[in-house]
Amino acid sequence: MEYFPAPLEKLVEQFARLPGVGYKSAQRLAFYVLGLPRDQAAEFSQAILDAKDRVHTCPVCQNLTEGDGPCAICSSYKREKDTICVVAEPKDVIAMERTGEYNGLYHVLHGVISPMNRVGPDDLRIKELVERVAQGGVQEVIMATNPDTEGEATAMYLSLIHISEPTRHLRIS
C-alpha cells in the first residue's frame, strides 16, 4: 500500500540514503523541502549540483577544493611545507584549522582502515601520501586520526610502512 505519491516517496528514499538519516527523518526532510517555495527548492537542488560539479579533491593533499588545481592550503606560501598532518576525512581539516594552532600541510586519507566495513589500506589515499613524502622536503608526519580502534589501526599501519626515512612520525593525543 502506497502512502505517498511516487515523487514524494522517491524524495524520502533519497534522503534516507544519507548517512545517519533514518526513514522518519527522511520523511521530515522531504516534507520540509516540499513546503519550500519553488525558488528555494530550486536553489537547494542547484547547490547540490554545483557542489557535485565544482568540488574536487586537491591533487596534492586530497582535501576538497574548488577546481582542478591545488587547494588554498597547499598553495599558500605561509604554510610550513615540511610538516604533513594526516587526517581521515576533509571535515578533520576544518576542525584542525579552527584551532588556529597548526600551520603545516595536510593529507586526507578519505577514511580509515576498517576490516568490519571491508576498508583496507588500498581503499585509502595512502599511496598518494607515500609518493608525496618520497618527493622529499617533508621532515615530520603527524598522525591525527581518531583515537578509536580504526583510527589507531590506521596510524599504526602508516607508521609500520615506513613512509620515508628519516621523516619523524608523531601521533597527536
Where are the regions that the model predicts?
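Cys/His-rich Zn2+-binding cysteine-cluster or related metal-binding knuckle/ribbon modules and their
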Residues: E2-E9, R17, A30-I84, E89-V93
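Acidic, metal-coordinating catalytic cores used for nucleic-acid/nucleotide bond scission
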Residues: T145-A155
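Single conserved hydrophobic/aromatic residue that forms the stacking wall/gate
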Residues: I161-S173
